[in-house]
């Protein structure tokens, strides 16, 4: 049974994720004129570039919507963002700079909460502005059907009639103007931006060329720290966690997680913290490029990971990071609520995050340049006296203990030496010239 409709279902209720921009405004009016009963749904995700959320539903009504709703998704979005930090659900990084999966997190929330609102209104057909080449078309498809198993999908941008009549921005602007809406296209930027409270994504157009970089981007959550005329002063910040939850910034306790995140964004944004340039694999395995902002996510992530390394042992940290990489990829693919993702997430929250209580003090400078100044926690397993270079009373172990430990290593050293001789005898290894060490063939320039 197909769930994707290739043509407009006239006479039926059709829900559209409405942003108020040119594309969704033209699509809504066009669908109304072609005979659909249009219902508009707008997600308040705390977008930093949106000044008046209440105006968007009113605009939808003016374009012909029977009903228009503004759905406040901010609390749920922050909840999912904190869960991602707790579980380290980030798999894309370049040179130590991390992409915090802010768009996938936003889609998980939007795709479930808007479809749930539609279901309340008896709307079982959903359309949005995602294109067939991107990730969002699959993310929204999965989250929508998870929320409403009876959902049908209608996307104007997959409808050939819509494309033929309103195939570009100029045609859509002319269409709105012809129907009395006096819609003026905004000036074309050199790239496209999508944002929510957790972060912003800049991509496409000029940014598709790798010779264009961060310098053409105008940050919406931070400052252009790469410019000499951008004044950025060092700032000391204290972040406090209690049982994995961020609860205070600079001594100010927050009961509202949204307010805490807004303050974290403001603090990190003053420095351009969390801004990065990534090449990534989309769900369909083609590579894309994006420049990302996530000042609050970056600030909380740095403090959280500092506590993780001071509290948990090496094997736990290794498992946390390996599972986080896997979970990040599932999140990116639109599988944040799949059973395998829930298993990884719940494990990290239960066995890693629950122990994360303490304060981390940082000095923020420009961009991702920062220093850790202090780490305090009642749960720290870091105890400097265990390894102090000074003489201490009641030492955890003695020289004799270390001699015994090293002696036990003779077993695997002997086994390894035997294996190396075997590899040498079979030609896999050879002796380095002038030294009694083993050397792989390609180390000497052997390309075979």
Swiss-Prot record:
UniProt: L-aspartate binding residues: 131, 135-136
Please give the pathway this protein is involved in: Amino-acid biosynthesis; L-arginine biosynthesis; L-arginine from L-ornithine and carbamoyl phosphate: step 2/3
Gene Ontology molecular-function annotations: argininosuccinate synthase activity; ATP binding; protein homodimerization activity
Can you list the GO cellular component terms from the UniProt entry?
cytoplasm
* Single Gene Ontology BP annotation: argininosuccinate metabolic process
Q: Does the keyword Nuclease apply?
A: no
> SUPFAM superfamilies attached here?
Adenine nucleotide alpha hydrolases-like, Argininosuccinate synthetase, C-terminal domain
Iron-sulfur as a keyword?
no
Entry binding sites for L-citrulline: 99, 135, 139, 192, 201, 203, 280
| Chief location of this protein within or outside the cell | cytoplasm
Q: Keywords on this record?
A: Amino-acid biosynthesis, Arginine biosynthesis, ATP-binding, Cytoplasm, Ligase, Nucleotide-binding
Q: Which EC class does it fall in?
A: ligase
Q: Which InterPro entries match?
A: Arg_succ_synth_type2_subfam, Arginosuc_syn_C, Arginosuc_syn_N, Arginosuc_synth, Arginosuc_synth_CS, Arginosuc_synth_type_1_subfam, AS_cat/multimer_dom_body, AS_multimer_C_tail
Q: Pfam families, per this entry?
A: Arginosuc_syn_C, Arginosuc_synth
Q: Where in the cell is it found?
A: Cytoplasm
Source organism, top-level taxon = Bacteria
What catalytic activity does the UniProt entry give for this protein? L-citrulline + L-aspartate + ATP = 2-(N(omega)-L-arginino)succinate + AMP + diphosphate + H(+)
EC numbers: 6.3.4.5
What family classification does the UniProt entry report for this protein? Belongs to the argininosuccinate synthase family. Type 2 subfamily.
Q: Which HAMAP family match?
A: Arg_succ_synth_type2
Describe its partners and assembly state. Homotetramer.
Q: What is this protein called?
A: Argininosuccinate synthase
């Amino acid at each position: 049974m197909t769930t994707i409709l290739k043509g407009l279902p006239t006479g039926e209720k059709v829900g559209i994720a409405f942003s108020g921009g040119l594309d969704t405004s033209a699509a809504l009016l066009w669908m109304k004129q072609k005979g659909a009963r249009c219902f508009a749904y707008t997600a308040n995700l705390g977008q930093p570039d949106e000044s008046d959320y209440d105006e968007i539903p009113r605009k939808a009504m003016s374009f012909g919507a029977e009903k228009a709703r503004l759905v406040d998704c901010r609390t749920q979005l922050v909840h999912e963002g904190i869960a991602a930090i707790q579980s380290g659900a980030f798999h894309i990084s370049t040179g130590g700079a991390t992409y915090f999966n802010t768009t996938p997190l936003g889609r998980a929330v939007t795709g479930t909460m808007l479809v749930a609102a539609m279901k309340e209104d008896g709307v079982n057909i959903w359309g949005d502005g995602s294109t067939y080449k991107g990730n969002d078309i699959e993310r929204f498809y999965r989250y929508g059907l998870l929320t409403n198993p009876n959902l049908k999908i209608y996307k104007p941008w997959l409808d050939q009639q819509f494309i033929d009549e309103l195939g570009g921005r100029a045609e859509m602007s002319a269409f709105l103007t012809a129907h009395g809406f006096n819609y003026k296209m905004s000036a074309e930027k050199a790239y496209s931006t999508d944002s929510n409270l957790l972060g912003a994504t800049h991509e496409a157009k000029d940014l598709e060329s790798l010779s264009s970089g961060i310098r053409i981007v105008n940050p919406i959550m931070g400052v252009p720290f790469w410019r000499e005329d951008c004044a950025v002063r060092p700032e000391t910040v204290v972040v406090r966690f209690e049982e994995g939850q961020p609860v205070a910034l600079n001594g100010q306790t927050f009961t509202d997680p949204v307010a805490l995140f807004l303050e974290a964004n403001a603090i990190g944004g003053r420095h351009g913290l969390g801004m990065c340039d990534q090449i990534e694999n989309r769900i369909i395995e083609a590579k894309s490029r994006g420049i990302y902002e996530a000042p609050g996510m970056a600030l909380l992530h740095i403090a959280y990971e500092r506590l993780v390394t001071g509290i948990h042992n090496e094997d736990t940290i290794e498992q946390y990071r390996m599972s986080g990489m896997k979970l990040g990829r599932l999140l990116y693919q639109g599988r944040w609520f799949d059973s395998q993702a829930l298993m990884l997430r719940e494990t990290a929250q239960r066995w890693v995050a629950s122990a994360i209580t303490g304060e981390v003090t940082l000095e923020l400078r420009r961009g991702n340049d920062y220093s850790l100044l202090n780490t305090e926690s009642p749960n720290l397993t870091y105890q400097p006296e265990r390894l102090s270079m000074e003489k201490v009373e009641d030492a955890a172990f003695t020289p004799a203990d270390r001699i015994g430990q090293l002696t036990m290593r003779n077993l695997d050293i002997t086994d390894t030496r035997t294996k190396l001789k075997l590899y040498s005898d079979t030609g896999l290894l050879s002796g380095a010239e002038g030294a009694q060490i083993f050397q792989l063939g390609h180390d000497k320039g052997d390309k075979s």
